[in-house]
């Protein structure tokens, strides 16, 4: 989905679809390998002004290897689960540069709003104009994911909370998160990222977006073209993933959003992308000088 993109684009004749993707069936559906862009649920006659990218109304939805960006809504601009849903399972997915137009005090104020049963592994949630996740109720299982650079002010600051909500069951382990509520006590099992370039805990990427929130047209990247949130080799995300903590078969993975195998470098990276600057794990051959004909030489 990164190099050869299948795009669901909400732009129609100068306007926008309210929701680019809507899951309105009580069964199961899979979104795999799509670029979901340019939904706008914040204006017009939209009855539900949340979920510009994906509106999950009913049933169970699996989102795999997708990029959800540049969507707008009053709240929950990227993805919204409503209380009538069953389960959301999201893996190897990037949710970036989505914009909320509502007030920070309102419900659903986040790029991704979750209810009931939400499970995420190896996702990158970044540069959204709102906190990354609001887990409103139910349970949230979050592993090996990045939440960084999500802010309601437009300027990234250390105090920006990346994840909020009142979910009753939380299992949040081995993620890289900029900031979270103090009472959640996340830092013994997660990495706290820095916003200071040059800091060892600053997550540098190959070709990230420059700014926060949706853009009106074109690309907002230093190298041009679509954003690529692949970590550089100096990033704290590299070789920091841990698949052993994931007991849910729905979340099991062995490759990233590009199909790059986790064996590269010896362990997976945190987030949807694997760094491509590392060599695959191979055999180690030892060459010793002056063999003495003993078992040790």
Regions found by a protein language model. Give the residues of each.
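Predominantly extracellular beta-rich ligand-binding scaffolds that present long acidic/polar faces
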Residues: 1-3, 48, 56-234, 247, ...
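Extracellular beta-strand-rich solenoid/capping regions of secreted or surface-exposed proteins
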Residues: 1-32, 37-60, 81-84, 231-233
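Bulky hydrophobic/aromatic "packing anchor" residues in well-ordered structure
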Residues: 8, 21, 95, 202-209, ...
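Short, solvent-exposed loop/turn elements at domain surfaces
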Residues: 16, 214-215, 246-247, 292-297
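Active-site and glycan-interaction determinants of carbohydrate-active enzymes
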Residues: 33, 38-48, 223-270, 278
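Predominantly extracellular/luminal cell-surface or secreted proteins
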Residues: 37, 148, 178, 286-290
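Right-handed parallel beta-helix/beta-solenoid
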Residues: 223, 276-297
